[in-house]
Amino acid sequence: MVKKHRETKETDISVELEIYGSGKCEIDTGVGFFDHMLNALCKHSLMDIKLVCKGDLFIDDHHSVEDCGIVLGSAIKESIYPLSCVERYGNSIVVMDEAAVECAIDLSNRPYLVYESSLNEKIGTFDSELIREFFQALAMNAGITLHLIRLRGDNSHHIAEATFKAFAVAFRRAISKNDRMGTPSTKGVL
């Protein structure tokens, strides 16, 4: 179990993370749609996540969503590195009705994000551009290479949810135990 806390003038965030959990989730960011997405991530990754964020929502959701990515990414990094006896790579295609999203992950300790998606400006009251901001912060702070590609879809809610679920499934596969793997790199270290 990894515990992280980060406090700034914009947000106060606490997270408890168990990457080899059962999908138990306690999320309270004050941003309803984002909570819904994090619950989906938790359920389909099988990570146990307790995350509480108090942010400056009177301004907008940006600081809360991005900073949750920073803190969750930092907790993931502490949980997975140094990498040993796991698959390292994971991928998935997740569909939700008409929407399909592909995710590929490399637990490389080389942070990078490729994000190709088009969504309506808003999903309810949620600024859809914050989905990219969240995954950018998560990838940079977790030290993972992350590709998220919208393959098809019209409904922005479906596309967003498929994105979080695709990440969850690919991450679960990347951290799958493989005792024969040792350090999964020809360099001998990640």
Swiss-Prot record:
**What PROSITE patterns does this protein map onto?**
IGP_DEHYDRATASE_1, IGP_DEHYDRATASE_2
Class of enzymatic activity (EC top level): lyase
Which residue ranges does UniProt annotate as crossing the membrane? none
Q: Which GO terms describe its molecular function?
A: imidazoleglycerol-phosphate dehydratase activity
Q: What is its main location?
A: cytoplasm
Gene Ontology terms describing biological process: L-histidine biosynthetic process
| Subcellular location(s) per record | Cytoplasm
Q: Report the EC number(s), separated by commas if there are several.
A: 4.2.1.19
Q: Which reaction does it catalyse?
A: D-erythro-1-(imidazol-4-yl)glycerol 3-phosphate = 3-(imidazol-4-yl)-2-oxopropyl phosphate + H2O
Pathway info? Amino-acid biosynthesis; L-histidine biosynthesis; L-histidine from 5-phospho-alpha-D-ribose 1-diphosphate: step 6/9
Acetylation recorded as keyword: no
Keywords, A to Z, come to: Amino-acid biosynthesis, Cytoplasm, Histidine biosynthesis, Lyase
Q: What are the record's GO terms for cellular component? A: cytoplasm
- Pfam families of this UniProt entry? IGPD
* UniProt superkingdom: Bacteria
Q: Does the keyword Membrane apply?
A: no
Family to which the UniProt record says this protein belongs: Belongs to the imidazoleglycerol-phosphate dehydratase family.
What is the protein name for this chain?
Imidazoleglycerol-phosphate dehydratase
Chain's gene name: hisB
